[in-house]
Design a protein with these regions (language model features):
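GIY-YIG nuclease catalytic motif and its immediate N-terminal context
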Residues: 1-34, 40-53, 57-67, 72-82
Length: 82
């Protein structure tokens, strides 16, 4: 089972990704060299959105869709979930 997630970086920007283990991935973003290059220089990050998506293909498509959105549209998604 895959998850699409959005983290908010310390500078107020958002990073969107996919994973099978959200908790592990957030720890990697904050403490590991396995994190995305984008988040390594913007630590700490905090999870602001997570959604379960069926398989890797569907998760990748949803990740791509979210990454194309404006910051305002991403905020709408985050606020609707919370």
């Amino acid at each position: 089972m895959y998850h699409v997630y959005i983290v908010e970086c310390v500078d107020g920007t958002f990073y969107t990704g996919i994973t099978t283990d959200v908790e592990r991935r957030i720890l990697e973003h904050n403490y590991s060299f396995k994190s995305a290059k984008y988040t390594r220089s913007r630590r700490p990050v905090r999870l602001v959105y997570s959604a379960v998506v069926g398989d890797r293909s569907a998760a990748s498509k949803e990740e791509y869709r979210i990454k194309k959105l404006t910051k305002a549209k991403k905020l709408d998604i985050i606020n609707k979930k919370n």
